[in-house]
């Protein structure tokens, strides 16, 4: 499945909620008609079956984190293999992706921008350049912006935007040196309450 390159608002409108795909300079409800689906008949949202609700939730989370279907299914298999709550573990795996951690630390305004920063070798993981967005960051790992990338205007803008976001207990960030430490595994209680991971588990469990 190819990566979607179309309008970001269209994806958020399809799911009926902000997927945080845009920078946040301006409220998404001002930029996107969030209360209507895209298309000619967007004003009328179809009533979904149980399967439809499960599928929409999976698509919403997959798009939110910018993960393709094959990779997302692998994350579910891994989460199901581990001990504990499968849904919470799935979100923990998604949150531990390097591109997401870069976004959470405020070095990028969106996850897509964070992914690009990683791919273009602008990020270091434990002192070594890492250009793999899906690399799993563990507790104690240090993520930093490479020296030659620190003066990029988009990174400076992202840092300013991040000041308006809620601080997370599981990461510690130094905005002067542009590096941060993942102190512990991501805490489900600090993640989006708009995600119903149980619907995703029910979908894949069939």
UniProtKB/Swiss-Prot annotation:
Q: Alphabetically list the UniProt keywords.
A: Ribonucleoprotein, Ribosomal protein, RNA-binding, rRNA-binding
Can you say what this protein is called?
Answer: Small ribosomal subunit protein uS4
Could you tell me which SUPFAM superfamilies the record lists for this protein?
Alpha-L RNA-binding motif (SSF55174)
This protein's species is: Francisella philomiragia subsp. philomiragia (strain ATCC 25017 / CCUG 19701 / FSC 153 / O#319-036)
Q: Which InterPro entries match?
A: Ribosomal_uS4 (IPR022801), Ribosomal_uS4_bac-type (IPR005709), Ribosomal_uS4_CS (IPR018079), Ribosomal_uS4_N (IPR001912), S4_RNA-bd (IPR002942), S4_RNA-bd_sf (IPR036986)
Main role? One of the primary rRNA binding proteins, it binds directly to 16S rRNA where it nucleates assembly of the body of the 30S subunit. With S5 and S12 plays an important role in translational accuracy.
Q: Which Pfam families match?
A: Ribosomal_S4, S4
Give the superkingdom in one word: Bacteria
Question: Which PROSITE patterns does the annotation name?
Answer: RIBOSOMAL_S4 (PS00632), S4 (PS50889)
- Subunit structure as annotated in this protein's UniProt entry: Part of the 30S ribosomal subunit. Contacts protein S5. The interaction surface between S4 and S5 is involved in control of translational fidelity.
């Amino acid at each position: 499945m190819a990566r979607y390159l179309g309008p970001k608002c269209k994806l958020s409108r399809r799911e009926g909620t902000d997927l945080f795909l845009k920078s946040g300079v301006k409220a998404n409800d001002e930029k996107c008609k969030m209360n209507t689906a895209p298309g000619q008949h967007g004003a009328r949202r179809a009533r979904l079956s149980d399967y439809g609700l499960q599928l929409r939730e999976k698509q919403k989370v997959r798009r939110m984190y910018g993960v393709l279907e094959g990779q997302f299914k692998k994350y579910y298999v891994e989460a199901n293999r581990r001990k504990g709550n499968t849904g919470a573990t799935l979100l923990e795996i998604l949150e531990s992706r390097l591109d997401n951690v870069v976004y959470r630390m405020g070095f990028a305004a969106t996850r897509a921008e964070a992914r690009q920063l990683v791919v273009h070798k602008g990020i270091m993981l434990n002192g070594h350049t890492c250009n793999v967005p899906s690399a799993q960051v563990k507790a104690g790992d240090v993520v930093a912006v490479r020296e030659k990338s620190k003066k990029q205007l988009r990174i400076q803008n992202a840092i300013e935007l991040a000041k308006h976001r809620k601080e997370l207990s599981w990461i510690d960030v130094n905005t002067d040196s542009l590096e941060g430490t993942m102190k512990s595994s991501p805490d489900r209680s600090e993640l989006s309450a708009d995600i119903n991971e149980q619907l995703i588990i029910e979908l894949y469990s069939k």
